[in-house]
C-alpha cells in the first residue's frame, strides 16, 4: 500500500519533523509512506488569500501521484474513528489505490481542489496548528496500518 501526505507549509518546528519521521519509520514494510512539503505562497504585497490558494493548488496538483485516491483534510469533512480509518485503508489497499492526503495552507484549499477529492476528512472539530495536524495524521495512519496488521500498538 502506498500512502502519500502532502502538506502546504515549510519551516516547521524540529519536534514536528522529528515526530513525523518517527511515525513514518514505524510503517516499515507494512506500507510505503511518503511525506512532502508544498511551498506556501507568500501573502501580502498584492497577493490575497484567494490568489495564494490558487498558486498552492497548482503546486499540490503537480505533487499528487498520478491516479491517486485523493483525500483532503477539511473542517467540513467526516471525522472517522481510528478503526474506520483502518477500514478505509483496507478498502483502498484491496482496490490497489495509492492514497494521497492533502493538508492545506493557512487559508485552506480552493473549492476546486476539494471537489476533486474523493473524500474529505477532518481529524478534529478543534482548530489545530498545521504542525500538529502533520503529526496527528501520520500517527493515525500508522495506527490504522497497525490495526490492519494486528499489531499491539492499538488497543480497544
From Swiss-Prot:
EC number, as in UniProt: 2.1.1.177
Report the InterPro entries cross-referenced here. Alpha/beta_knot_MTases (IPR029028), RlmH-like (IPR003742), tRNA_m1G_MTases_N (IPR029026)
Q: Which UniProt keywords apply?
A: Cytoplasm, Methyltransferase, rRNA processing, S-adenosyl-L-methionine, Transferase
Quaternary structure (record): Homodimer.
For the ligand (S-adenosyl-L-methionine), the binding residues are: 73, 104, 123-128
Q: Name one Pfam family in it.
A: SPOUT_MTase
Recorded GO MF terms: rRNA (pseudouridine-N3-)-methyltransferase activity
Q: Which family does it belong to?
A: Belongs to the RNA methyltransferase RlmH family.
Designated gene of the protein: rlmH
Q: Which residues cross the membrane?
A: none
Where is it located?
A: Cytoplasm
Which reactions fall under this protein's catalytic activity?
Answer: pseudouridine(1915) in 23S rRNA + S-adenosyl-L-methionine = N(3)-methylpseudouridine(1915) in 23S rRNA + S-adenosyl-L-homocysteine + H(+)
Q: What is this protein called?
A: Ribosomal RNA large subunit methyltransferase H
An annotated GO cellular component: cytoplasm
Q: Has UniProt tagged this entry with the keyword Transferase?
A: yes
UniProt-listed SUPFAM superfamilies: alpha/beta knot
Q: Which branch of life, at top level?
A: Bacteria
Q: What's this protein's function?
A: Specifically methylates the pseudouridine at position 1915 (m3Psi1915) in 23S rRNA.
Under the heading NCBIfam families, the entry gives: PRK00103.1-4
How far does the signal peptide extend, from start to end residue? none
Taxonomic lineage is: Bacteria, Pseudomonadati, Pseudomonadota, Betaproteobacteria, Neisseriales
Amino acid at each position: 500500500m502506498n500512502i502519500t501526505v502532502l502538506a502546504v507549509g515549510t519551516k516547521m518546528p524540529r519536534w514536528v519533523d522529528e515526530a513525523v519521521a518517527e511515525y513514518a519509520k514505524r510503517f516499515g514494510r507494512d506500507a510505503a509512506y511518503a511525506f512532502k512539503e508544498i511551498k506556501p505562497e507568500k501573502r501580502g504585497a498584492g497577493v490575497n488569500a484567494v490568489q495564494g490558494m490558487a498558486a498552492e493548488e497548482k503546486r499540490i496538483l503537480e505533487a499528487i501521484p498520478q491516479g491517486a485516491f485523493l483525500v483532503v483534510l477539511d473542517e467540513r469533512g467526516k471525522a472517522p474513528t481510528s478503526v474506520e480509518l483502518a477500514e478505509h485503508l483496507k478498502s483502498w489497499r484491496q482496490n490497489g489505490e495509492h492514497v494521497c492526503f492533502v493538508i492545506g495552507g493557512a487559508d485552506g484549499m480552493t473549492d476546486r481542489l476539494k471537489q476533486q477529492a474523493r473524500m474529505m476528512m477532518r481529524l478534529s472539530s478543534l482548530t489545530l496548528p498545521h504542525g500538529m495536524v502533520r503529526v496527528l495524521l501520520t500517527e493515525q495512519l500508522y495506527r490504522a496500518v497497525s490495526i490492519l496488521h494486528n499489531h499491539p500498538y492499538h488497543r480497544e
